[in-house]
């Protein structure tokens, strides 16, 4: 496999520092990517430690399979399958779960993967190109209403309805023009609709993000894996999540806050707060890339890392 598309791991040392509390623990990397975090975790583990990583991308799996370490195992699946996969391996509790969300640089930079609006390629956008429906296939059948909702809700795009209508209008010309199946043409359609320019952002950014999230069911999978991680963490275990846009971070923030807060007590009921079960999580804060990291890797600028520890048995 070539190395033409390089990936810089964001918040590498900070994430591993927050995650690894026991060198003999069992850890999970929910998004192997190109292995930056996984290799750093393995470097911190002792002989009895163990790391189980997940990824949907076949190229990530190829990279992971080059790691010759008896303490490491890669699972070709979404992190949403984490609970079942660990149950199947006899793993009931883990010392830490790391989730580095979003798309990796090799996925974005390779036009053949269909994530990029900067270089023309097939309109795919699947993290795992061997499974599920591609972006082109979904765009070929989605209604104006469904397109509008996805682009509005997952892209926070105020021109969602106009973009949806333009996509459907282009689809009506398929007999003459052929199918809408290239990233370049989709970006062009969006560019004709979105006349305003956000500083440093291509007009197609929000629409491509929205379609990618929908095709890969990213937010639904995130909800599933957060619940799984909470159930898997041992007392003292850490959950570390790196998000790259507000939709992801909002879900993570609300989940962590909900499980780090004591339930409200109705003063009219004969129940003392001290009699209620303690919340399972303690929030350990959040971190952002420093100026030097952002200068070296501009894609890190939107990253936020949230850390929580399981305090209940």
UniProtKB/Swiss-Prot annotation:
Known catalytic reactions: cytidine(1402) in 16S rRNA + S-adenosyl-L-methionine = N(4)-methylcytidine(1402) in 16S rRNA + S-adenosyl-L-homocysteine + H(+)
Question: Where is the protein situated, by its record's location annotation?
Answer: Cytoplasm
Please give the superkingdom of this protein's source.
Answer: Bacteria
Q: Name one GO cellular component term.
A: cytoplasm
User: What keywords is this UniProt entry annotated with?
Assistant: Cytoplasm, Methyltransferase, rRNA processing, S-adenosyl-L-methionine, Transferase
Q: Does the keyword Methyltransferase apply?
A: yes
EC number(s) on record?
Answer: 2.1.1.199
Q: Top-level EC class, please?
A: transferase
Q: Could you tell me which Pfam families the record lists for this protein?
A: Methyltransf_5 (PF01795)
The UniProt annotation places S-adenosyl-L-methionine binding at 35-37, 55, 79, 100, 107
Q: Which InterPro entries match?
A: RsmH, SAM-dep_MeTrfase_MraW_recog, SAM-dependent_MTases_sf
GO process terms (BP): rRNA base methylation
Q: Which GO terms describe its molecular function?
A: rRNA (cytosine-N4-)-methyltransferase activity
The principal location of this protein is cytoplasm
Identify the HAMAP family for this entry: 16SrRNA_methyltr_H
Tell me which family the UniProt entry assigns to this protein. Answer: Belongs to the methyltransferase superfamily. RsmH family.
- Functional description taken from the UniProt entry: Specifically methylates the N4 position of cytidine in position 1402 (C1402) of 16S rRNA.
**Protein name stated in the entry:** Ribosomal RNA small subunit methyltransferase H
From which organism does this entry originate? Burkholderia pseudomallei (strain 1106a)
């Amino acid at each position: 496999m070539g190395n033409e598309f390089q990936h810089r791991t964001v918040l590498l040392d900070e994430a591993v520092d927050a995650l690894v509390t026991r060198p003999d623990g069992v850890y999970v990397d929910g998004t192997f990517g190109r292995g930056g975090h996984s290799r750093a975790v393995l470097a911190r583990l002792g002989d009895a430690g163990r790391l189980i990583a997940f990824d949907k991308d076949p190229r990530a799996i190829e990279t992971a399979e080059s790691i010759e370490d008896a303490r490491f195992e890669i699972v070709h699946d979404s992190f949403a399958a984490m609970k079942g996969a660990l149950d199947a391996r006899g793993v009931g509790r883990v010392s830490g779960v790391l989730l580095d969300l979003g798309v990796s640089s090799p996925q974005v930079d390779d036009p053949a993967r269909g994530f990029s609006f900067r270089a023309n390629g097939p309109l795919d956008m699947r993290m795992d190109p061997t499974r599920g429906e591609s972006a082109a296939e979904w765009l070929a059948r989605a209604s104006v209403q469904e397109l509008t909702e996805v682009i509005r809700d997952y892209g926070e795009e105020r021109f969602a309805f106009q973009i949806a209508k333009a996509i459907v209008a282009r689809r009506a010309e398929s007999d003459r023009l052929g199918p809408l199946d290239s990233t370049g043409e989709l970006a062009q359609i969006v560019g004709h609709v979105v006349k305003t320019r956000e500083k440093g952002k291509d007009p197609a950014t929000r629409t491509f993000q929205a379609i990618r999230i929908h095709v890969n069911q990213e937010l639904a999978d995130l909800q599933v894996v957060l619940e799984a991680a909470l159930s898997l963490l041992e007392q003292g275990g850490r959950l570390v999540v790196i998000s790259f846009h507000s939709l992801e971070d909002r879900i993570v923030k609300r989940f962590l806050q909900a499980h780090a807060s004591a339930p409200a007590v109705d003063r009219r009921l004969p129940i003392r707060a001290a009699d209620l079960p303690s919340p399972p999580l303690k929030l350990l804060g959040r971190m952002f890339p420093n100026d030097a990291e952002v200068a070296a890797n501009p894609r890190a600028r939107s990253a936020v890392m949230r850390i929580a520890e399981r305090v209940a048995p």
